[in-house]
Amino acid sequence: MDPMSLTLPTPRTPDPMSAPPLRWGVLGPGGIATALVTTLHANTRQRLVAVGSRSQERAEQFAARFGAERAYSSYEQLVADPEVDIIYVATPHSEHLANALLAIGAGKHLLIEKAFTRNAGEARQVRDAEGAA
């Protein structure tokens, strides 16, 4: 059989609207969080339910803008919310380790984008904490 005559199957791309909706919490309501939530709302059935910030005012503004039900003035309050399934960490990368460990300790799933942590050692700490949870 000639390998050039093989027909490859059409790739299947999952429909993002078919994914089960998760209840998201945003930790750090800044520009990158705005981009993520805008994309989630436009392309999926995911729900933003809570926002945590060091500033109650910023949390409330972000929550109002994107329809979140709750706004918290601390990250601890956000991760303690039983109605949040997954935390999007949108703080400066120098804070990612502490934020990730806080969320993992509360039993939450995480999404952390680049830079994941400041270095490989911190990344291993997050991996190890998640593995132990």
For every predicted segment, state its role.
Residues D2-F66:
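N-terminal Rossmann-like dinucleotide-binding module
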Residues L40, A103, E130:
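Short hydrophobic alpha-helical segments of the AMP-binding
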Residues A63, R127-E130:
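Conserved hydrophobic residues forming the short capping helix/wall of the S-adenosyl-L-methionine
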Residues E69-R127:
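Beta-loop-alpha module in the N-terminal Rossmann-like domain of NAD(P)-dependent dehydrogenases
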Residues G107, A132-A133:
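Glycine-centered short loops/turns at secondary-structure junctions
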